[in-house]
């Protein structure tokens, strides 16, 4: 039964204040405690960018976070790009804004989609995502779990060329290979190459093909009923705008007496942050201001849990098949374990046996979702 406090207009006496203090437990300060602890610890976010060369990936990242991560980048010739294999490059930078610290990691994929034969060109990328899951699983299962570093990919911005008539086979192959492992946010790159009617047609075509090929891109969560109308309107606009048509620019130009980031053409100026020109502001708001935490939650609660359940299932199946095995066989090929690793595996063996009993319950929960 809740107790309501009625405040009168007269000045409160010391006795009244004592009565109020007696009825105040103090757990209402929990959000403040969590906020202070989170700000002190800082936040981390790993963003992958993928797509063929020349679509403005690095420029868009610079525009989003106002940080140049590609100072030492070497530009390759067309011939070098054709012969280049897919690489995985990480760029990490610490950003601070109003006392809030963010450790941002950008995972770049140079060489993707540039070869003459692009079959299975996404394999190094899927392997990288799996390796981060595996490393986190090992750290989480270890004895020292205080300072686990989260390198899991929380979001993948996939750049689609504006010059085609929809998704290319390599686009479909990439997204289908990763859609169960990472949150994919498709983008139409270099939207200033298209007029508004062409952008609308291309968006409709991409949405149709995403449904046709059964690709699971990141789904915006539904708004709570108690959210204010402005937030609900913003959420509707985000959902209607996907896939986002974006423009990036590191150049400051003058438009109507104001200095803005944009591109200068003979016919006028395209402003990066003008919502009438592109969806850059919507993407930035979604990625940083409204949905960054949800992207991390979906990574942890859905994609990583699927990987973890698969690992546990394989381990317990192996234990069931051969009870004489001293330790479960890891999922991915590993170097020969040392004495400390063997000891750790033996200690975890009993825990894995208990987890086998929980496996059926976990499967049922996943099916219910």
Curated annotation (Swiss-Prot):
One GO CC term on file: cell cortex
Modification(s) after translation: Phosphorylated by DYRK1A.
Coiled-coil regions, chain positions: 338-369
Cross-referenced Gene3D superfamilies: P-loop containing nucleotide triphosphate hydrolases (3.40.50.300)
Quaternary context: Septins polymerize into heterooligomeric protein complexes that form filaments, and can associate with cellular membranes, actin filaments and microtubules. GTPase activity is required for filament formation. Interacts with SEPTIN2 and SEPTIN5. Interaction with SEPTIN4 not detected. In platelets, associated with a complex containing STX4. Interacts with PRKN; this interaction leads to SEPTIN5 ubiquitination and degradation. Interacts with DYRK1A. Interacts with STX1A; in the cerebellar cortex.
Protein name, per record: Septin-5
Binding site for GTP: 51-58, 85, 111, 190-198, 248, 263
Residue ranges constituting the Septin-type G domain according to the UniProt record: 41-314
């Amino acid at each position: 039964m809740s107790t309501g406090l009625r405040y009168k207009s007269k000045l409160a006496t010391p006795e009244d204040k004592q009565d109020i203090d007696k009825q105040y437990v103090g757990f209402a300060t929990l959000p403040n405690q969590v906020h202070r602890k989170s700000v002190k610890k800082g936040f981390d976010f790993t963003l992958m960018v993928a797509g063929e060369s020349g679509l403005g990936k690095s420029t868009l990242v610079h525009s989003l976070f106002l940080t140049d991560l590609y100072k030492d980048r070497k530009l390759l010739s067309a011939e070098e790009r054709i012969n280049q294999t897919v690489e995985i490059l990480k760029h990490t930078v610490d950003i601070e804004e109003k006392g809030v610290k963010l450790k941002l990691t950008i995972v770049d994929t140079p060489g993707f989609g540039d070869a003459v034969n692009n079959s299975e060109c996404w394999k190094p990328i899927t392997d990288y995502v799996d390796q981060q899951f595996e490393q986190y699983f090992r750290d989480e299962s270890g004895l020292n779990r205080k300072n686990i570093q989260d390198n899991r990919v929380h979001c993948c911005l996939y750049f689609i060329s504006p010059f085609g008539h929809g998704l290319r086979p390599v686009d479909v192959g990439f997204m289908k290979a990763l859609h169960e492992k990472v949150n994919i946010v498709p983008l139409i790159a270099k939207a200033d190459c298209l007029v508004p009617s062409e952008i609308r047609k291309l968006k409709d075509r991409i949405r149709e093909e995403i449904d046709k090929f059964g690709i699971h891109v990141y789904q915006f969560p539904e708004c709570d009923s108690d959210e204010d109308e402005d937030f609900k309107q913003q959420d509707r606009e985000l959902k209607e705008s996907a896939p986002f048509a974006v423009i990036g620019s590191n150049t400051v130009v003058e438009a109507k007496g104001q200095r803005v980031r944009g591109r200068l053409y003979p016919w006028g100026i395209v402003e990066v942050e003008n919502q009438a020109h592109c969806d850059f502001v919507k993407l930035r708001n979604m990625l940083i201001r409204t949905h960054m935490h949800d992207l991390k939650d979906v990574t942890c609660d859905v994609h990583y849990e699927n990987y973890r359940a698969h690992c546990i299932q394989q381990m317990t199946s192996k234990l069931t098949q051969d009870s004489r095995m001293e330790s479960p066989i890891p999922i991915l090929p590993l170097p020969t374990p040392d004495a400390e690793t063997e000891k750790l595996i033996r200690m975890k063996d009993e825990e894995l046996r208990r987890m086998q009993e929980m496996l059926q319950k976990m499967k049922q929960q996943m099916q219910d979702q």
